[in-house]
Amino acid sequence: MAKLHDKYQETVVAELTKKFGYTSVMQVPRIEKITLNMGVGEAVADKKVMEHAVRDMTAIAGQKPVVTVARKSVAGFKIREGYPIGCKVTLRGERMWEFLERLVDIAIPRIRDFRGLSAKAFDGRGNYAMGVREQIIFPEIDYDKIDKIRGMDIVITTSANTDEEGRALLDAFNFPFKK
């Protein structure tokens, strides 16, 4: 089992129950899923780009991503309906906890000029979204084997009802928020 999952069960549940006065353990917010999304607009011109993006995403997430396609044609972007334009992967369970551990302990500290995560990126329902500018912050990515530096979106979906509860949950996992 992942270290953070054990920490959640042993200490975080008790802390949050005490802080917010929950009457049941099931009321305590938990992380439900983590979604990684990589938009690859250049895939319209070159099909190889999508293969590289899928390879990188597979290495980072530990499971194969779903290739997302354009829902409708947009002449300005030179895309047609059905063109592959990105890839996404949803992590749950054990893989989710392992990814969260790597994100907090290894990847986030490797971000260049990092000054803390924005605390304003909550959506009003306790879910947190962040963007990463380069995939090379993850240790699974070999700098010499990548074709291009790409960013991705990381969305952490929680069962929290408010941003305050969501922030308290992520704070308990040592997320480095700006003070």
UniProtKB/Swiss-Prot annotation:
It holds the Pfam family Ribosomal_L5. SUPFAM superfamilies: RL5-like (SSF55282). PROSITE patterns: RIBOSOMAL_L5. One of its GO terms (molecular function) is rRNA binding. GO terms for biological process: translation. One of its GO terms (cellular component) is ribonucleoprotein complex. Keywords: Ribonucleoprotein, Ribosomal protein, RNA-binding, rRNA-binding, tRNA-binding. Belongs to the universal ribosomal protein uL5 family. This is one of the proteins that bind and probably mediate the attachment of the 5S RNA into the large ribosomal subunit, where it forms part of the central protuberance. In the 70S ribosome it contacts protein S13 of the 30S subunit (bridge B1b), connecting the 2 subunits; this bridge is implicated in subunit movement. Contacts the P site tRNA; the 5S rRNA and some of its associated proteins might help stabilize positioning of ribosome-bound tRNAs. Part of the 50S ribosomal subunit; part of the 5S rRNA/L5/L18/L25 subcomplex. Contacts the 5S rRNA and the P site tRNA. Forms a bridge to the 30S subunit in the 70S ribosome. This is Large ribosomal subunit protein uL5. It comes from Shewanella sp. (strain MR-4).
